[in-house]
Regions:
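Sec-dependent signal peptide recognition
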Residues: 2-8
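C-terminal motif of bacterial Sec signal peptides marking the signal peptidase cleavage site
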Residues: 13-15
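C-terminal His-loop and adjacent cap/lid subdomain of alpha/beta-hydrolase
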Residues: 17-358
Length: 358
């Protein structure tokens, strides 16, 4: 209820007040640099919170990852980026609070609460003998920067307390994570990069850097409820100015045309599986991206028609305004009787039968 009210207020207070975007931030990509390269060692088959001292959540405290190593070792990694809204100014960050954890200090207890959801969904259930993920190392990247995991900026939004800063450091945090994760899993052969909502956007926008960091592994992408469409009106300018997002340098058009990222990834990484899960008229994305009524439906249809024509780019799309499909991983069934679980498993295993569902 609180999130729904915040989203309603977001629409009412901001739809007509988009400032003109400032200068374009420079794109950036490549292998991560800086930070520790020490491997992470934690007990197998249990979740451990691993803070990284050089990283920052929104309030300036350390960010980190949750790690659940496979028993007996593995050359497979499931890397999941968490979602939880976004914020880009004083109203969204501190009044409406439309992004999770930007004022929180992340802890082991919070990690356990969040990863329990993944197990309940079925993604990290090691007891499911049908799961292609059951013997993989699990890595969970919490979301505490409000920037779709791709920001590289520190902002002072509180004019009454100018010393209060918000760290939109999702991209630089990911740099640090990748350095140590590569050292922890140097022999990885398969990496599944997944995310829901804000995490789905982070997964898509970070795919190039993850693939470069794990250059010896096959990296495949699954973005849930994260249609890579352009926000409406001036909203993308507001977000871009706040976050200074880290965009792949190979995608020269991405700063002004986000769907072009999929074209770039499909060309740069041929044969990699690029999957999308979506509700075609997602109401949550409609509000965050400032679309008029029905606008997300048209934007989604355009994305599917123009970007998901590449070899190995596929979608599982349901009609409606709901948000997040992976919560129904074990129960959702799409057109033609195709279950979401079977579709995701086909994506994960490279099944030639993997195809569009709508």
């Amino acid at each position: 209820m609180r999130r729904a009210l915040a989203l309603l207020l977001l629409t009412l207070t901001m739809a007509c007040t988009a400032p003109a975007p400032g200068p374009l931030p420079g794109p950036d990509a490549g292998t991560p640099d800086g930070g520790s390269t020490e491997p992470i060692s934690t007990p197998a088959s249990q979740w451990t919170w691993v803070p990284f001292p050089e990283t920052r959540c929104g309030n300036g405290t350390p960010a980190g990852v949750g790690l659940n190593p496979a028993p007996g070792g593995s050359r497979k990694v499931l890397l999941f980026l968490a979602g939880g809204g976004a914020c880009w100014d004083p109203v969204t960050c501190y009044v409406l609070k439309t992004a999770v954890h930007v004022e929180d200090t992340y802890t082991q207890a919070l990690l356990e609460t969040e990863v329990a959801q993944l197990t309940a969904w079925g993604l990290t259930d090691r007891q499911d003998e049908t799961s292609p993920f059951r013997d993989a190392h699990f890595v969970y990247v919490p979301y505490c920067t409000g920037d779709l995991h791709v920001g590289d900026a520190v902002r002072s939004y509180d004019s009454t307390h100018p010393q209060r800063q918000l760290h939109h450091r999702g991209a630089s945090n990911m740099d640090a994570f990748l350095l140590r994760l590569k050292a922890t899993f140097p022999d990885a052969e398969q990496l599944w990069l997944m995310g829901s909502s804000a995490g789905g956007y982070g997964a898509q926008l970070s795919f190039d850097r993850v693939s470069l960091a794990f250059s010896g592994a096959r990296v495949d992408l699954l973005a849930d409820s994260a249609q890579l469409v352009m926000p409406y009106g001036g909203r993308w300018g507001e977000m871009r100015n706040a976050w200074n997002p880290r965009l792949p340098s190979e995608c020269t058009e991405c700063a002004q045309d986000l769907p072009k990222l999929l074209d770039t990834l499909a060309t740069r990484w041929p044969g990699r599986r690029l999957g999308l899960l979506a509700y075609d008229n997602d109401a949550t994305l409609t509000l965050y991206f400032n679309y008029p009524l029905g606008g997300m439906l048209g934007a989604t249809q355009s994305l599917l028609a123009n970007q998901y024509t590449h070899d190995r780019a596929r979608y599982f799309v349901l009609g409606g305004t709901d948000h997040v499909l992976l919560s129904g991983y074990k129960s959702l069934v799409g057109p033609g009787g195709v279950s979401l679980k079977s579709w995701v498993q086909q994506w994960a295993t490279g099944d030639p039968a993997w195809s569009n569902v709508r």
